[in-house]
């Protein structure tokens, strides 16, 4: 079995090789590799990309998809026993109709039950094993039973963890529903966890009651969710906070406390069971993910073993890897001795969207069986598919050119779109290289360092999925990424006017566009109109003048904003004012940066979160309205978000942003899911085809309410605004608009502000007024559009530059150095850094 599993995993790794990216024949099989010497700094002419994909593996996996015809709603658990695959699934039961004893209204709902199924691998037909019977709820009680975990035994039988709970409302004979509630008579009944040993036909072999013995303080943790069985028959059950160990008869041997961090029960091999948990070492003041083996002899945890910091959902190891784990939708193997990890299963390479996965199993013959549950929003229904991965000769698969996408974590929405692109494209497929997989608990930037090192050596990916860590300006200045206007200008459908113009202008660098986000939100600051509304400029002098209108002890922002907070936020919102990667120049010795330092220095050095005496009126709205605070930092991503955050302020508000030396409002865009294309890729047109796919469907996403930020496409943005300004009416069962007693149509509020009960420190309760907002007004729309029109910068964070600044300003914040001397040192060090990188 171990050898077969190893062969399977190694062959799955080879899928990546089969789909290798655009590398020229005869060169390295690493996607996007050139012949530049390692460690050298390439010029644009040295950066090269491939012409065609190269087949580098003998074997690959072919995915076969089949619809599951069984009448169950969803799959709970899956495991393989021999060549059979078993499913624990929820089945739609009978429809129940009940009548409310108080109102007389009737309502219906469906019951569900758990069933055990055996799957026919050839047809996809799932047959329910009717010999399997779940524990029944006693008459007169309510409750439920759930299969939490399944594990196959070597002899083809199954172990199943079943949790059972009951309750009832034991109302008296004279119970009157008009004056009393049945919830006053709630009684909790029997609650237990059982381990069922089940034969291949579903019949019960044995049942072990593994109800733990707990103290009164431990009763809170009463839901065992997983188990392991070792070769001696000992059972290990866990509920995150505790691990309970039983012998083969179900007798509890001992219990272990997983500490305040909790622990996930996992089995490293047939005889080694323990927990994965976070451990902090006081001596070294370091911490990380650790495996704590359970020692049966000492009835305690053994010596901690280091695990990858991004490891979750563990699987037993074999003769190659000590254990396997999930990370970002893929499976990795881990070697404890060398403390190294390797990706062994990449679902995207098999055209499988792991977002939809219910579970998978590995068969002895090397096949992999996975189950996908996909919701079709158009049809309003979900479907279940079985996917069988079968090893085939790589040469039998259609050859496609690979587009290598570099990222620092792949979000779930984009994963689905990549799978769809790979399935439908006859010529290309996207190969994802997630550099976050190289991060360690000691170095969370190791992946970013590796990506930049590869770029410097000439290995440039075709496509970048951007995030805050990626230095886009540096890439643009070095000629690594392309001007996207060349693709937009030659596009048959799109033009520059297809996009939200203020955002594009803010993203431009010397008239060129190097990144394309799919959505954005606004970051700014506002104050009360009666306080900041009359200023024609917004400089530090203006801010200081506005502070004189407030209470003597008023703060600029909330009490918890510190010097370092303000410095980082101000620089990230406008770093382009101080660093120009195109010309490799910096200007930190400018009056603007000196003024920024002085502004940041006006805030407290730190904030004592633990000992601060919080008051009821410490919320931002109350502080602004009462004159205790000048400005509120705000980010909003939709028109409704604006309504939620910006209503309820005395005299209205005005967006002024951060103060600046030129007096303009310092607002910024924060972009989401941004793309950049390699300047030297041979797959530029195909890469752009994928990017434009993410843009063209945005208007439909607005209709479906499946986009959560302002869209970058102008037509989608306009439709989002139109929907926000359009009221939503209430309809009756005939589809007709409902009206109130005054003949006015009834609307659904887009937002409800206030309401509820306010409790003062002395216990006094005050009913708060509730305000419902039904649509965005034209005046509010004009405010938002004006704010977007007057936003000229994009939030950008360069960790290396920020580290230099943080290091140098420490003495200034401590009063040991002047702002001018600090600015001069920052100028010198950042200038040296920029020259080294250019």
Range-by-range predicted roles:
Residues 733-830:
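C-terminal capping/gating helix-and-loop segments adjacent to ligand/active sites or protein-protein/ligand interfaces
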């Amino acid at each position: 079995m171990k050898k077969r599993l190893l062969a399977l995993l190694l062959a799955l790794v080879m899928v990546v090789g089969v789909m290798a990216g655009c590398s020229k024949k005869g060169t390295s099989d690493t996607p996007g590799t050139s012949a530049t010497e390692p460690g050298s700094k390439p010029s644009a002419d040295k950066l090269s990309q491939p012409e065609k994909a190269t087949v580098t593996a003998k074997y690959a996996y072919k995915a076969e998809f089949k619809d599951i015809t069984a009448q169950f709603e969803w799959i709970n658990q899956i495991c393989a026993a021999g060549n059979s695959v078993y499913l624990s699934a929820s089945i739609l039961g009978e429809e129940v109709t009940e009548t409310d004893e108080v109102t007389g209204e009737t309502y219906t709902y469906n019951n569900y039950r758990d069933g055990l199924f055996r799957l026919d691998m050839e047809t996809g037909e799932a047959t329910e094993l009717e010999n399997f019977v779940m524990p029944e709820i006693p008459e007169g009680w309510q409750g439920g039973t759930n299969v939490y975990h399944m594990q196959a035994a070597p002899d083809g039988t199954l172990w199943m963890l079943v949790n059972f709970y009951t309750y009832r409302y034991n109302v008296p004979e004279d119970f009157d529903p008009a004056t009393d509630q049945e919830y006053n008579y709630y009684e909790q009944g029997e609650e237990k966890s059982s381990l069922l040993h089940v034969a291949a036909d579903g019949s019960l072999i044995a049942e072990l009651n593994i109800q733990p013995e707990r103290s009164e303080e431990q009763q809170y943790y009463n839901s065992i969710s997983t188990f392991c069985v070792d070769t001696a028959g000992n059972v290990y059950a866990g509920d995150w906070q505790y691990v309970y160990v039983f012998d083969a008869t179900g007798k509890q041997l001992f219990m272990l406390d997983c500490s305040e961090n909790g622990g996930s029960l996992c089995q490293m091999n047939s005889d080694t069971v323990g927990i994965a948990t976070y451990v902090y070492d006081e001596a070294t003041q370091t911490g990380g993910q650790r495996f704590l083996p359970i020692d049966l002899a000492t009835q305690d945890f053994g010596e901690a073993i280091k695990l990858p910091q991004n490891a979750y959902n563990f699987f037993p190891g074999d003769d190659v890897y000590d254990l396997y784990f999930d990370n970002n939708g893929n499976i990795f193997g881990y070697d404890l001795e060398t403390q190294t990890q390797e990706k062994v299963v990449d679902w995207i390479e098999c055209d499988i969207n792991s977002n939809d996965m219910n579970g998978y199993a590995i068969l002895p013959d090397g096949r992999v069986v996975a189950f996908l549950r996909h919701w079709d929003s158009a049809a309003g229904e979900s479907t279940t598919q079985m996917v069988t991965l079968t090893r085939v000769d790589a040469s039998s698969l259609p050859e496609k050119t690979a587009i290598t996408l570099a990222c620092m974590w792949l979000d779930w929405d984009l994963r689905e779109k990549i799978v769809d692109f790979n399935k439908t494209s006859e010529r290309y497929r996207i190969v994802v290289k997630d550099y976050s997989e190289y991060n360690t608990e000691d170095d969370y930037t190791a992946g970013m360092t590796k990506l930049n090192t590869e770029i410097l050596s000439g290995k440039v990916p075709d496509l970048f999925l951007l995030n805050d860590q990626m230095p886009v300006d540096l890439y643009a200045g070095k000629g690594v990424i392309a001007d996207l206007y060349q693709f937009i200008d030659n596009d048959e459908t799109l033009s520059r006017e297809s996009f939200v113009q203020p955002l594009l202008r803010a993203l431009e660098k010397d008239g060129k566009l190097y990144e394309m986000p799919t959505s954005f939100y606004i970051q700014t600051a506002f104050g009360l109109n009666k306080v900041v509304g009359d200023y024609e400029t917004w400089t530090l002098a203006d801010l200081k003048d506005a502070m004189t209108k407030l209470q003597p002890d008023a703060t600029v922002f909330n009490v918890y904003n510190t010097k370092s907070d303000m410095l980082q936020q101000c620089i990230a919102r406008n770093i382009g004012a101080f660093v120009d990667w195109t010309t490799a120049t910096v200007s930190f010795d400018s009056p603007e940066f000196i003024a920024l330092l002085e502004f940041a220095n006006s805030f407290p050095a730190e904030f004592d979160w633990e000992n601060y005496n919080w008051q009821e009126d410490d919320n931002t709205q109350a502080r602004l309205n009462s004159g205790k605070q000048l400005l509120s930092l705000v980010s909003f991503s939709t028109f409704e978000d604006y309504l939620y955050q910006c209503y309820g302020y005395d005299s209205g508000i005005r967006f002024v942003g951060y103060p600046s030396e030129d007096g303009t409002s310092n607002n910024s865009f924060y972009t989401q899911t941004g793309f950049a294309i390699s300047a030297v890729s041979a797959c530029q047109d195909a890469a752009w085809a994928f990017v434009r796919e993410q843009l063209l469907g945005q208007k439909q996403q607005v209709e479906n309410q499946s986009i959560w930020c302002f869209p970058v496409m102008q037509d989608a943005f306009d439709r989002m605004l139109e929907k926000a300004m359009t009221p939503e009416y209430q309809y009756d069962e005939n589809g007709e608009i409902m009206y109130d007693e005054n003949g006015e149509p009834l609307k659904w509020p887009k937002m409800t502000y206030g309401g509820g009960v306010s409790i003062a420190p002395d216990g006094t309760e005050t009913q708060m007024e509730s305000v419902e907002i039904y649509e965005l007004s034209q005046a509010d729309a004009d405010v938002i559009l004006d704010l977007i029109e007057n936003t000229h910068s994009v939030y950008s964070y360069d960790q290396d530059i920020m580290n230099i600044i943080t290091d140098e300003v420490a003495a200034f914040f401590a009063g040991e150095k002047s702002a001018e001397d600090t600015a001069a040192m920052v100028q010198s060090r950042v200038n040296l850094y920029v020259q080294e990188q250019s």
